UniProtKB/Swiss-Prot annotation:
Motif (DDXXD motif): 299-303
Organism: Aquilaria crassna
UniProt name for this protein: Delta-guaiene synthase 3
Residues binding Mg(2+) 2, per UniProt: D299, D303
Recorded metabolic or biological pathway in which this protein acts: Secondary metabolite biosynthesis; terpenoid biosynthesis
UniProt binding sites for Mg(2+) 1: D299, D303
């Protein structure tokens, strides 16, 4: 706790301090840019030539279905599948209808199953029954087969006992075999045991897989080179976007004006790029990066620095959504409020320029107001000493975790669908949005509740569950981890049941959940980004792949 005066606060008040570390990047992304494409028309020509070669490989008719399945999977895992969405969909439809899978071995069946389920095709897990022996047990010692089986099990839904058995079997075998494996299979297995592909940020997974694939004796040279060039080309685009975001952040001078808050514009960009990296979603990334930046400042103000009176004034100003309201909030908050209004006004202008209409901006503003209300409730928990029930806490945290907001804003930014109907549906917090939000909350609370308690907070999913069900801290944490698995199964199930409206929400729900899995796998990688988060950002946004 500290006595602090910021802005024009009229009196000293006791305020908390989370002691967040300063940015680990300084002005690096403000000045750095890739020279990969600079005066290099030959690279663009080579990229186009290789893309056509890969497309030809993908669409050519063949009776060798296992090879076609492996090629399709490699294209997706290498991060270049977005170039061939139509062709991949056509291939998967053929593979879904084909009965020759009865002749596939366990390795090919596992890849086939994961590919199809991962793209929304309903495939029964009974396809694995024929790989059990007379004792009802799986039996294989082949590491590559075990790796593929393990990856496939993470698309399981509730009640699939055979996949529950398969995940235990394959994990145990892989852990035992790992020390004996050599590159690149050892890294493939290690990565999967750490974060399986289905739960990994797809851009990060591609960065990991590109050198692994390149070392395979059976690699296709044109595909390997295409993946490297495409990664570096996309990285150059992402660097330009982050440079623009860093310039905006610096112009507002948020770090010096709000020293109690997290200075994490690069980490926020990594978050949004992880959710949708494709070039066509540049507008959405730009908007969402600024949104996560301003939301993070508001969150820290409500959680750490602001008094209850101050944050209540800010909440009221957000409800008014009027520049005149800035006069009614403390001076130190005004830069946040002005920045917030500016983001939405800029986004509105971009929507009009890009699509000729801006009706969706009302959805964006409303969902932003909703998250501020949820922050207000959490501030009231702390300042009044009110302890909510577990269900009450979770109901509010589904909103305060931000994933409903991010999913809806991402849908608006992407603009691919009949938006009004989709946004009306997503605003009701349907099952896939709820599952994604709950996974985010459980993961977040497991990694942050102790740090929050050190600064005086006593309300978290862990503590509320302990209090309500009279269990130990260890038991409550175990329950949270079990709930993460339950919600992942529910999320998987909703993707298989998606209709025309809900299918547009599948990818945002999955990708935002994946980002949380990765960002919080070794702690709160957003608040403390000095370790593995910094390394991952550097791999994606700083270091090009050698060609």
């Amino acid at each position: 706790m500290s006595s602090a005066k910021l802005g024009s606060a009229s009196e000293d008040v006791s305020r908390r301090d989370a002691n967040y570390h300063p940015t680990v990047w300084g002005d690096f992304f403000l000045t750095h840019s890739s020279d990969f494409l600079e005066n290099n028309d030959s690279i663009l020509e080579k990229h186009e030539e290789l893309k056509q070669e890969v497309r030809n490989l993908l669409v050519v008719e063949t009776s060798d279905l296992p090879s076609k399945i492996q090629l399709t999977d490699d294209i997706i895992r290498l991060g270049v599948g977005y170039h061939f969405e139509t062709e991949i969909k056509a291939q998967l439809e053929k593979l879904h209808d084909h009965q020759l899978h009865l002749n596939f071995d366990l390795l090919t069946t596992s890849v086939w199953f994961r590919l199809l389920r991962g793209h929304g095709f309903s495939i029964s897990s009974d396809v694995f029954k024929r790989f059990k022996n007379t004792k009802g047990e799986f039996e294989t010692e082949d590491a590559r087969t075990l790796w593929c089986l393990y990856e496939a099990t993470h698309l399981r839904v509730d009640g699939e006992d055979i996949l529950e058995e398969a995940i235990q079997f394959s994990r145990k075998k892989l852990e035992a075999l790992l020390p004996e494996l050599s590159f690149p299979l050892n890294e493939c297995v290690r990565d999967a045991l750490h974060i399986p592909y289905h739960r990994n940020v797809q851009r990060l997974a591609a960065r990991q897989y590109i050198p692994q694939y390149d070392a395979e004796p059976t690699k296709i040279e044109s595909l390997s080179l295409f993946a490297k060039i495409d990664f570096n080309m996309l990285q150059a685009l992402h660097q330009r976007e982050l440079r623009e975001a860093s310039r905006w952040w610096k112009e507002f001078d948020f770090p010096s004006k709000l020293p109690y808050a997290r200075d994490r514009i690069a980490e926020g960009y990594y978050w949004m790029m992880g959710a949708h990296f494709e070039p066509k979603f540049s507008l959405s990334r730009k908007f969402l990066n600024r949104i996560i930046g301003i939301t993070s400042l508001i969150d820290d103000t409500y959680d750490v620095y602001g008094t209850l009176e101050e944050v209540t004034l800010f909440t009221e100003a957000v409800e008014r959504w009027d520049i005149e309201a800035v006069k009614d909030i403390p001076k130190y908050m005004q830069v946040i409020y002005i920045g917030m209004l500016g983001i939405f006004e800029d986004f509105k202008d971009n929507l009009i320029n890009a699509r000729g209409k801006d009706y969706c901006i009302d959805y964006a503003i409303e969902v932003f107001k909703e998250i501020v209300r949820s922050y207000q409730r959490e501030a009231e928990y702390f300042h009044t000493g009110y302890v909510p029930s577990y269900d009450e806490y979770m109901e509010n945290s589904i909103i305060s975790g931000g994933y409903k907001m991010f999913i809806i804003l991402m849908l608006i930014g992407r603009g691919e669908f009949e938006l009004k109907e989709t946004l009306d549906w997503a605003s009701t917090i349907p099952e896939m949005v709820k599952a994604s939000s709950l996974i985010a909350r459980y993961i977040d609370d497991l990694q942050t509740y102790k740090a929050e308690e050190e600064r005086g907070e006593t309300v978290s999913a862990v503590r509320c569950y302990m209090r309500e069900y009279d269990v130990s801290e260890e038991e409550a944490c175990k329950k949270m981890r079990e709930m993460i698995e339950i919600e992942w199964k529910r999320l998987n199930k909703t993707t298989l049941e998606a209709d025309e409206v809900s299918s547009s929400v599948v990818i945002p729900s999955l990708n935002f959940t994946r980002v949380l899995e990765v960002m919080y796998d070794k702690g709160d990688g957003y608040s403390d980004s000095q370790g593995v988060t910094k390394d991952r950002i550097a791999a994606l946004l700083r270091h090009a792949i050698e060609i």
